[in-house]
Design a protein with these regions (language model features):
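Noncatalytic, beta-rich nucleic-acid-contacting surfaces in large DNA/RNA-processing enzymes
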Residues: 1-590
């Protein structure tokens, strides 16, 4: 479990060394830093080993750990079985006077855990202190309890209470029989789920060290953390969003500044080129080496000429991710010429092999710029299309998010989609709980029911971070109508199914447009004669939904509300089509 974390720690220390700052010796860092414990107690534990689940955060906010012993106990308690002891432990920590021991002999054993049995070692100590077991025999009891050997434990109960050869027994040691019987019951209930303390302590060391690095070196730590999850788009998105929430900028991918992997850059995190889809890490390593040896790329065509191993899919993905934005051209322009540019560079490289020719040798020494392959005077992609292409090429929205306009509404909801995805039934969210979340409908599919009596809806509901499977029964699917389409922003209410063997799913029983109740779409026209209005309404009718539309006549300074049958669903597809038809500057949601 700790291997990934050890890699993150190693890479974090490497980034710190690169920055020229002193590298902390974690073996010498004391486990007593109040600021680190305050961060943990606040639930700010993204990326902290063993402490980042929603339920654990909630527990930590109640516990408010302030010492290493609390971390060891917290990791041990937050498991099925021992979890029942959490309220008692928290109460004991914050009110030591409430701690009650079944017998005085238990106090020195359980005082550090406020009267609660938390570790297997405590069970071993109890049978030794109360009944006179040897070290070896106490370990046999621990093993029998953990493996639920009931026949063995029935005998051990009698030995614990009344003794046997080599065992004094609790009664002979001054413990009342009823008390001894009760203590043995508590050990039985607890021991089958218990951690051993040494195991929990090893986990707590990693938990503290990752928390320490997160607090004092957040840029380096989050960069290393993101790199450790490059194969998981949802997890990368989660930590990118976490960085932004901590005021850390995540800079876009750029062929002149990015490395193959994510890297710290001037107090920010630079997106790694290898995280762009269809772009091989090996090719990007070659690119970085070329840039390091021969300087930054002067322009798009210089990049095509100097980097070996490129293909058209790679170039398209790099353009869509914004990797050439700093060179001054528009993404739409690069998308229009990249195939010709790559063909030209391949031809020149072949010629170079025979005659030492380069792109700079063409046309009497002129560089291959717009004179040879001109960048078209094309308008930039609409913001919606740009976001879609960013998502297609990186798995993330880089220059914004389709849900940004709904941020205030989403903040008012009790849960987020990533919290539903991570729920394990032990935290705030329980299995089959009714929840309401906001997100984007994606991967929408319809399939017949087994009886053939209707259609089921299957989709993935995506939040700003995280995603959860969504299921709609025929009645709900029929009611959803136009909302069951890709990229539709929705407010979904339903029952969460928490499953151990596969991803959680949300059984949706009600779905509404997200934020549409308070917004209207305004479309501005220089003038609005009847024929223009008729064509506009015909366009709107192709995107039926709940958002009211106002057609504004600039010449008369009058707004006309479109009839309800021309209300629209605000999706990425609709906004892209509307911007193309009416002009980006002529449509507005408010």
């Amino acid at each position: 479990l700790g291997l990934r974390t050890l890699t993150v720690i190693r890479d974090t220390l490497g980034f710190i060394e690169e920055s020229g700052r002193p590298v902390p010796d974690l073996d010498r860092v004391p486990f007593t830093d109040d600021k680190v414990y305050q961060m943990i107690a606040a639930g700010d534990t993204d990326g902290v080993f063993q402490l980042e689940s929603g339920g654990m955060r909630q527990f930590l906010s109640q516990l408010k750990p302030d010492c290493f012993e609390d971390l060891i106990a917290g990791i041990s308690l937050y498991r099925p079985g021992p979890m029942e002891q959490i309220p008692r432990y928290v109460k004991g920590k914050h009110n030591p006077g409430s701690v009650v021991y079944s017998h005085p002999l238990l106090e020195p054993i359980l005082c550090t855990t406020y009267g609660c049995m938390v570790y297997q070692e405590q069970v071993m100590e109890i049978v030794r202190a109360l009944a006179g077991y040897s070290y070896g025999r106490s370990d046999l009891v621990r093993r029998a309890m953990s493996k639920k050997k009931h026949d063995v434990m029935a005998k051990e109960r009698q030995y614990f209470i009344h003794g046997t050869e080599g065992v004094v027994g609790a009664v002979a040691n001054g413990v009342p029989e009823a008390v001894a019987d009760k203590i043995f019951d508590e050990m039985m209930d607890f021991a089958s789920y218990a951690f051993n303390k040494s195991h929990a302590a090893a986990y707590a060391v990693l938990a503290y060290r990752t928390a320490y690095l997160k607090y004092y070196y957040p840029v380096e730590f989050l960069t290393a953390l993101i790199n450790s999850f490059l194969g998981s788009v949802d997890t990368v998105a989660k930590y990118v969003y976490s960085a932004r929430n901590h005021g850390i900028k995540v800079l876009p991918p750029d062929v002149n500044f990015s490395r193959a992997r994510f890297a710290p850059e001037g107090g920010a995190i630079r997106f790694g080129l290898a995280a762009v889809r269809n772009v091989g890490g090996a090719v990007m390593e070659v690119m970085v080496k070329e840039r390091t040896q021969n300087g930054r790329f002067l322009h798009f065509f210089d990049f095509c000429d100097r980097v070996d191993g490129l293909n058209k899919r790679m170039l398209e993905a790099l353009i869509s991710a914004g990797c050439f934005d700093s060179m001054g051209g528009k993404r739409a322009q690069y998308l229009a010429v990249y195939e010709r540019a790559l063909d030209a560079s391949v031809a020149v490289k072949k010629a170079r092999g025979a005659g030492q020719m380069s792109l700079f040798d063409l046309e009497g020494g002129d560089m291959l710029q717009s004179e040879q392959i001109p960048l078209p005077n094309a308008p930039e992609l609409s913001h919606q299309i740009m976001l879609v292409k960013e998502r297609e090429s990186t798995g993330l929205y880089l220059s914004g998010h389709p849900l940004d306009n709904y941020e205030e509404q989403l903040k008012k909801l009790k849960y987020t989609i990533d919290e539903l995805a991570e729920a394990d039934g032990t935290g705030a969210i329980k299995d089959e709980e009714q929840v309401t979340v906001g997100g984007l409908m994606t991967q929408c599919k319809q399939r017949p029911t087994r009886s053939g009596s209707g259609l089921m809806g299957y989709a993935v509901l995506e939040g700003i971070t995280g995603s959860v499977e969504a299921v709609l029964f025929p009645r709900t699917l029929q009611q959803a109508g136009h909302l069951f389409v890709d990229d539709a922003p929705v407010l979904a209410r339903g029952k969460l199914n928490i499953r151990e063997d596969r991803a959680n799913s949300l059984l949706i029983d009600e779905i509404k447009p997200l934020g549409e109740a308070n917004r209207s779409l305004y479309i501005r026209f220089e003038s609005l004669p009847d024929d223009v209005m008729t064509r506009a309404c015909a366009f709107l009718k192709r995107y039926p939904g709940e958002t009211p539309v106002v057609l504004y006549d600039a010449a008369k300074k009058i707004g006309k509300s479109a009839p309800k049958e021309f209300h629209v669903a605000i999706t990425d597809a609709f906004l892209a089509a509307a911007e193309e038809r009416f002009g980006k500057e002529c449509i507005k949601l408010k």
